[in-house]
A protein has these predicted regions:
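Hydrophobic alpha-helical connector segments
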Residues: 62, 76-103
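Short hydrophobic/aromatic patch on the recognition helix
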Residues: 43-53
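Hydrophobic/aromatic residues within well-ordered alpha-helical segments
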Residues: 13, 56, 63, 67, ...
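An amphipathic alpha-helix adjacent to DNA-recognition modules
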Residues: 11-19, 31-32, 52-76, 80
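Amphipathic alpha-helical packing segments from all-alpha helical-bundle domains
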Residues: 117-159, 163, 178-181
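Basic, helix-initiating cap at the start of DNA-binding domains
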Residues: 1-28, 37, 41
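Solvent-exposed, amphipathic alpha-helical segments
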Residues: 20-28, 70-78, 157-168
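C-terminal peripheral helix-coil segments that are non-catalytic and often amphipathic
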Residues: 136, 140, 160, 164-199
Length: 199
C-alpha cells in the first residue's frame, strides 16, 4: 500500500519525480524509462508513483509541461525586459535550450518517437499546425526577420537538428555537435538574411 505523504512532501517528491524522469529519459529513452526506475531513483515505492500521476504517459505530459514552463523562463531571461531580440540572440537562446536539461527531445531514439506516437494522446508534438503556431510565436519575438520567410521551412530546419540526434547511431558521432552548430547558423541566416555560414 502506498505511503501517505504530507502536502509538503507531496510537492517535494512530485518535483523530484519530474526532475529524475527528465534525466532518465535522456539516459534510457522514454520507452525504457520505467515507473520502477523513476521511483527507485527518488526512493519511494513503485505504488506511490500513482499518488502523483495516473500513468507513465500522464507523467511524461507533466514533465513536458514543466520543461515548457522552465524554457519560457529561459526565454524571458534572454529577452531581459524587451519584447524582441535579434535572430542571433534567438539562436543563442535556442542553442542553450537544446543543450540544457529541459530539452526532452534531446536523446530520443526512433523507438522513443514510435512509443510517443502510440501512447501519448496529446499529439501537439507531431501536429504540423501546432508547430507552425509555435514557430510564428518565436518569429514574433525576433526583430530582424527578413521578408518572405517560410514558417514551414523554419520548422523543418529546427526539426532537422532533432533528426540528426534521433539517428545518431547512423551518423559520424565526432561531427554531431559541429553539424548541429552549422544547422543553427543556417537557421539564423535563413531568419535574418544576414551573414554566411562561416561568420
Amino acid at each position: 500500500m502506498p505511503t501517505a505523504f504530507t502536502e509538503e512532501e507531496m510537492k517535494r517528491i512530485r518535483g523530484e519525480l519530474i526532475n529524475v524522469g527528465i534525466r532518465l529519459s535522456k539516459e534510457l529513452g522514454l520507452k525504457k524509462m520505467s515507473v520502477e526506475k523513476i521511483t527507485s531513483a527518488v526512493g519511494i515505492a513503485k505504488g506511490s508513483f500513482y499518488l502523483f500521476f495516473e500513468s507513465k504517459e500522464d507523467f511524461i505530459l507533466e514533465a513536458a509541461k514543466y520543461a515548457g514552463q522552465e524554457t519560457q523562463k529561459m526565454l524571458l531571461l534572454k529577452l531581459n525586459g524587451r519584447t524582441q531580440m535579434s535572430a542571433h540572440e534567438f539562436i543563442e537562446f535556442f542553442n542553450e535550450f537544446i543543450h540544457s536539461g529541459l530539452d526532452l527531445m534531446n536523446g530520443l531514439t526512433i523507438d522513443d518517437f514510435f512509443w510517443l506516437k502510440k501512447h501519448i494522446k496529446k499529439q501537439a508534438l507531431f501536429d504540423p499546425e501546432a508547430q507552425i503556431q509555435t514557430a510564428r510565436l518565436w518569429l514574433s519575438l525576433i526583430n530582424d526577420v527578413r521578408d518572405g520567410i517560410d514558417v514551414g521551412t523554419f520548422v523543418n530546419l529546427i526539426k532537422s537538428i532533432y533528426a540528426i540526434r534521433e539517428h545518431r547511431d547512423t551518423m559520424v558521432r565526432e561531427s554531431l555537435e559541429s553539424s548541429v552548430q552549422i544547422l543553427l547558423r543556417t537557421i539564423e541566416i535563413y531568419i535574418s538574411g544576414k551573414g554566411n555560414i562561416y561568420d
